[in-house]
Structures are given as C-alpha cells and as structure tokens.
Regions:
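A short glycine-rich, Lys/Arg-flanked "PGG" loop and its adjoining helix->strand segment in the class I
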Residues: 120-135
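A short acidic, Gly/Pro-enriched loop at the edge of an enzyme's catalytic core
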Residues: 95-107
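Class I SAM-dependent methyltransferase Rossmann-like catalytic core
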Residues: 9-21
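Conserved alpha-helix/loop element of class I SAM-dependent methyltransferases that forms part
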Residues: 21-40, 55
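Conserved Class I S-adenosyl-L-methionine
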Residues: 3-8, 49-51, 170-262
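A short SAM/SAH-binding and catalytic strip from SAM-dependent methyltransferases
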Residues: 105-119, 142
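Class I SAM-dependent methyltransferase SAM/SAH-binding core
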Residues: 41-97, 121
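Conserved class I S-adenosyl-L-methionine
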Residues: 135-163
Length: 262
C-alpha cells in the first residue's frame, strides 16, 4: 500500500467550506484565552485564507498584522477578503520567516504547527521575531487524541484500507510535546488549554460536501464509484442525525502560550 500524499491547501474556496468554520470557532476560544490586549503588532504564521487574521482584526484592533502562508492560492483568497490597511499578506515559509528579530508583540500559529516539517524550527522562528516580553502561542487539533474534525472520515478511510494523509508532525499536537518544546526554547509563563468546539451540518449532504468533497486530501477523486458509495454508507452509519437530519461533529485542540524572556 502506497502512503497517502501530503496534505496541500491550494484551493481557497474548498478550504473555506472544509476548515474555515472550524478555524473560526477554535480561534474565537483561543483569542479569548490569549487576551493580549488591543493595539498590538501580530504575526499570523500559516495564515491560510485569513480566517484567523479576520478574528484578530475584529477582536483586538491590532496596530498591524503580518499574515504569511506558503500557498499562493490561500494568500490570494485572503486578499479577496481582507482589505484592512494594517494587514500585510505574504507568501513564505514558517521555518524561515522574512521578518527582523524582536519585531512583533504577538506571534501565533493557528492550526499550523503540526503541518510544519520541523516544529522546533517553526516555533524558534516565532520566538525570534517576537519582542522580549511578547507572546508566543499556538494551537493545533489534537490529532493524536482523535480531536481533529476529520477524525470520523479518517477512521472510516483507515477501515477501508485507504488511509488519508495526516499532518507530518502530528506528535506535536500532544500537550506534553508542546510544553516540552516551549520549555526547551526558554519561553516563560507557559500555560496550556484544551479548546472544544462543535459544528452542525444541515444534513449528511452538507457534511459530505464540506468535509469529504472539499477535503484537501482529494479523497473522492482517488476512490472508485463503489468505494465512494461504501465510504458514504460508513459515515452515515457512524454519524447520528437529529430528527431534522442535522449532524453535529465535535473536535478539540491543544493550545499553548507563553512569553519571550525580557
């Protein structure tokens, strides 16, 4: 059996259906907990289509936000949504940020760190560009604990012998791994929190379009007609619907924050 192809986020519209609602729910909880105050300078590392940056703009009136992502398609999608003058959208690598050291008050990776091939390098870069005393923070879906929104899909694909792609650095989603990394980097005043969210789909067709057809793994295109029908049956059996046909799925993320030594 060949390994699944790496996850790539190249379709901004599909990402909006697939992950943006989840991202906004988790991001709102994360920002309430982060509580950095208004008027700060931010870097949003792995900004995707700008969903988290939009939350920052709405909640904390930042003086500036540098939002960076490796996908030109995602950044283009963000440009279509975000026109705020204090936002700078760029294409770039989380492991080699194009910013001066000690520049930002707040550095965040929102649902990104487990996609970084070398999480330590990514976190080190966030720390480097953060001002002394500034906040360095991250949250990721708890992949190892079954908390990612795609878990029902992953489980059924695994059972069919068609494993879906996983984030390359899934181990960093564990609280123990996050705390060890932040401690190893010398980040102070470290705190952690679990973020629990849910999403309700109008019916199974809504779930299928949002979480399967729109998946960045391109799952449906890799299955035969019979396999697609089997996957639908498995997911319908697994996901209970309400009397109205609505389906509610739960997910949870591991979050960490701390401050750069002054």
């Amino acid at each position: 059996m060949s390994p699944p192809e790496p996850i790539k986020f190249t379709d901004g519209a599909a990402y909006e259906r697939f992950m943006a609602p989840w991202s906004r729910s988790a991001g709102a909880l994360f920002l309430d907990w982060l509580a950095p105050g208004t008027g700060r300078s931010w870097v949003d590392v792995g900004a995707g289509n700008g969903a988290f940056t939009e939350l920052v703009l709405a909640k904390y009136a930042p003086s500036s936000v540098c939002a960076i992502d490796p996908s030109d398609a995602q950044i283009e999608a963000a440009r279509k949504k975000i026109s705020a003058k204090q936002v700078e959208l760029s294409i770039g690598d989380a492991m080699a940020l194009p910013y001066d050291s000690n520049r930002f008050d707040v550095a965040v990776m929102a649902l990104v760190l487990f996609f970084v091939p070398d999480p330590r390098k990514g976190a080190s870069e966030m720390l480097r560009v953060t001002k002394p005393g500034g906040i360095v923070a991250s949250y990721t879906w708890d992949v190892m604990g079954g908390g990612i929104p795609a878990q029902p899909l992953w489980d059924e694909m695994d059972a069919m012998g068609k494993p879906a792609a996983r984030p390359p650095s899934a181990e960093i989603s564990r609280f123990a791994a996050l705390k060890a990394l932040w401690a190893d980097l010398g980040i102070r005043d470290v705190e952690t929190r679990e973020l629990v969210v849910e999403r309700t789909f109008a019916d199974f067709d809504d779930y299928w379009l949002s979480m399967v057809v729109s998946s960045p793994s391109g799952i449906v295109g890799k299955l035969t007609g019979a396999e697609t029908a089997e996957l639908k049956r498995r997911l319908q059996d697994r996901l209970p619907a309400s009397a109205s046909g609505a389906i509610t799925v739960h997910a949870w993320a591991t979050a960490i924050k701390g401050r750069k030594a002054a």
